[in-house]
């Protein structure tokens, strides 16, 4: 029996699936249950929740994983037989091209990304089950590439894989289907199914063909990875018993109203009715990001493309608000840590060699004898008194005077944040991300920027369903207050 579980935002899809897992565990062995999802994050979250709920170990649940990793295991592939970033770079060198590659599981998002349009065309074609030429003719790439260059690239890539006996992620799935390597399960769960590519649907089918019961869970309205090969139409056309989740535990009423307006613009979708929670919630509109008062609470700030986050960073930086950009390492983290360690040292706490060398890096020779780091006992703990007595440390002033070698801009930022009462030893209150980067996330306050880049604007006009789904996902991250920033150009941008 095949059941399609439709899970609108915040309706507890994973919990529902685990309750079904529970029923099967009463009558079957854990290793007869397959639970596959698109991202590693979701597969492991389900596995960990199942382990604690049913008191099982990781070994009891060998089939809670991504489809890629099932294929990898069943085909008995070794890690060094898989095309890695270095292989793509090496191939690029040999061809005189730049071929970069970001791991499928960078961020555990299950997505393949590259800046090389040649490689992207080849990969997306494979995921969609079409030829590279057919993908080329869809004109989704932006770089100037000739068909001849593409054919040459395909030839060289195949030759490279043969020469070095390598396989790539998508080949694994195709091989798995060809070799018919699926175990026999009593029940299979396929989560986040709206993100599967045509090739992965083929693999899913080869698994459920040998299985008594199958649950396919997802939400076509949240299918935001079509550009990366996801095949939402296969999800929409699935037949089986429909199990519709109707109560959202996340979305308040006003956000539900906005979400309904957006979702009704999507042409190709499965109809769903779902209810918000009882809270009314809040909705605000602004002309400019700087008008939003973000001095308190937890925030998710969402833009359509990565580069749009840079201006927002500048605003938060100048206001002295504690934030992180999901796509960058925190520029101040090292300095905060040193500040905390320094303050502890001044209070009489002893600190390690590593902490001292970090502190020393923000001081000039006038304040710290750098040479002594060579002779210092790496395993000992040190106090302010011992460092001062040895004349290694020549100041015990407050950090912003003592750290005379620290970049002044960062010092000012940290001081401003502290004046604002920001808690610098915990995770930042404000997270900046693209909408694609927070799928599955939620926050009390969500700021949604509706500007579109030129490329996106063009895509929106040609294919509005993709952008409608994306802004639906953006709006439905809000647990309480949705803050919408109107587009800078009223003729462009996404209207909410």
Give a label for each model feature:
Residues 343-485:
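Conserved helicase C-terminal RecA-like lobe
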Residues 1-7, 16, 32, 103-189, ...:
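Accessory N-terminal region flanking or inserted into the helicase ATPase core
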Residues 58-76, 321-345:
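Conserved beta-strand -> loop -> alpha-helix junction used to position metal-binding or nucleic-acid-contacting
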Residues 66, 168-172, 428-436:
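Conserved two-lobed SF2 helicase motor
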Residues 1-81, 260, 473-476:
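P-loop NTPase Walker
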Residues 79-98, 262-270, 338-372:
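A polyampholytic, Gly/Pro-enriched intrinsically disordered region
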Residues 8-14, 38-41, 194-280, 300-318, ...:
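Conserved helicase motor core of SF1/SF2 NTP-dependent helicases
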Residues 284-297:
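Conserved interdomain hinge at the start of the Helicase C-terminal
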């Amino acid at each position: 029996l095949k059941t399609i579980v439709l899970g609108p935002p915040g309706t507890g899809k994973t919990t529902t699936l685990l309750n079904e897992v529970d029923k099967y565990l009463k009558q079957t062995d854990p290793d007869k249950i397959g639970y596959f999802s698109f991202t590693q994050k979701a597969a492991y979250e389900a596995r960990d929740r199942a382990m604690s709920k049913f008191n099982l170990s990781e070994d009891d649940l060998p089939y809670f994983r991504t489809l890629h990793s099932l294929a990898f295991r069943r085909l008995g592939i070794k890690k060094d037989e898989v095309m890695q970033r270095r292989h793509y770079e090496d191939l690029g060198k040999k061809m005189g091209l730049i071929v970069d590659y970001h791991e499928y599981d960078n961020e555990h998002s299950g997505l393949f990304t590259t800046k090389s349009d040649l490689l992207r065309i080849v990969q997306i074609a494979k995921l969609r089950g079409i030829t590279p030429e057919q993908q080329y003719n869809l004109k989704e790439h932006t770089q100037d590439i000739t068909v001849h260059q593409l054919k040459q690239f395909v030839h060289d890539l195949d030759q490279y894989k043969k020469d070095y006996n390598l396989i790539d992620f998508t080949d694994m799935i195709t091989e798995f289907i060809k070799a018919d390597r699926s175990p026999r399960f009593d029940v299979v769960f396929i989560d986040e199914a709206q993100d599967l590519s045509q090739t992965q649907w083929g693999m899913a089918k080869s698994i459920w063909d040998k299985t008594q019961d199958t649950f396919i869970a997802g939400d076509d309205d949240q299918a935001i990875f079509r550009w990366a090969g996801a095949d939402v139409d296969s999800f929409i056309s699935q037949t089986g018993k429909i199990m519709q989740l109707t109560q959202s535990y996340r979305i308040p009423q006003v956000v539900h109203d906005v979400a309904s307006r957006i979702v009704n613009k999507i042409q190709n979708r499965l109809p769903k009715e779902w209810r918000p929670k009882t809270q009314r919630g809040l909705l605000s509109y602004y002309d400019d990001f700087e008008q939003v008062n973000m001095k308190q609470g937890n925030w998710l700030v969402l833009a359509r493309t990565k580069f749009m986050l840079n201006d927002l960073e500048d605003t938060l930086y100048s206001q002295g608000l504690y934030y992180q950009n999901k796509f960058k390492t925190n520029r101040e983290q090292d300095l905060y840590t040193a500040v905390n360690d320094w303050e502890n040292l001044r209070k009489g706490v002893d600190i390690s060699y590593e902490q001292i060398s970090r502190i020393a890096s923000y001081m000039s020779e006038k304040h710290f004898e750098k040479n002594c780091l060579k002779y210092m006992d790496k395993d000992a703990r040190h106090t302010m008194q011992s460092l001062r007595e040895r004349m290694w440390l020549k100041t015990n002033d407050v950090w912003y005077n003592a750290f005379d070698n620290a970049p002044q801009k960062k010092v000012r930022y940290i001081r401003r944040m502290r004046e604002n009462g920001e808690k610098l030893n915990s995770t930042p209150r404000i997270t900046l991300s693209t909408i694609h980067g927070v799928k599955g996330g939620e926050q009390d306050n969500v700021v949604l920027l509706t500007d579109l880049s030129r490329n996106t604007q063009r895509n929106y006009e040609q294919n509005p369903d993709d952008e409608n789904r994306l802004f639906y996902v953006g709006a439905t991250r809000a647990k309480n207050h949705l803050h919408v920033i109107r587009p800078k150009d009223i003729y462009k941008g996404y209207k909410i």
